[in-house]
Amino acid sequence: MADEASNPELMEKLVSLCKRRGFVFPSSEIYGGFNGFWDYGPYGCRMKRAVEALWWKEMVETRDNIEGLDSTIIANPTIWKASGHIDQFSDLMTDCKTCKARHRVDQMDDPTTCPACGSKDLTEPKEFNLMMKTFVGPVFDDEHVAYLRAESCQPIFVDFHSVRVAARQKLPFGVAQIGKAFRNEINPRNFTFRSREFTQMEMEFFCDGEDGMKWFEYWKEQRINYYKKLGFSEDNMRIYVHEKLAHYAKAAIDIEVKFPFGWGELEGVHHRGTWDI
């Protein structure tokens, strides 16, 4: 949807600067590009690694109760079935019958009108699953289907017991990792913000059930203060409290930042209850 805080001219300048100075390039550019995928250049990868190192120091190296993990991108597909991703990780999509453009319904100002050409001749909205599918092994059939992970938290839940035993941790403690995630976005846009391959920095904190909200409030405050220490001003940062929760959440907030395209989520803090355990 349109955002009154958006500045398209500034966004255009930012994209041009990033490419010209070697921060971010369109992937596969000499072959026409590949929508939703970006490569980090010499300065971009330095900046990216610096951000990751700062986050890792804050979340892992300075805490005795947070352990690290580096899990695989592809795992047993049963994990994604159990987590609800195969059945519920989707967005509503509609197609314009006039210009053939495809749109995510919740990003349209008017869900009855095509934002590309203005036509009202649209298909009925339908669920579009965001999981990227592949095959493992020499046979391409349903029994060998696998998925690129859509988020980095699920392997943390799967390896929870192994990490706890190996690190000799007791509740409460957390597991953090930095790694790639993949989502088959209907309409990639806003530069690297809404892309199909991206890096996530994630920490899952485990505690007794009755202490869930206490720790949710603790981490909410910790993460807000982290961005304040980095220099984010109150004018350019706000907290969005979710009223409509994801299938796994008991409470959730987003830390939003004012980007050139408007307000967008930089980080989420979610109370997942016992959904994944």
Where are these regions (language model features)?
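TRNA-recognition modules of translation machinery and tRNA-sensing kinases, especially anticodon-binding
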Residues: 2-277
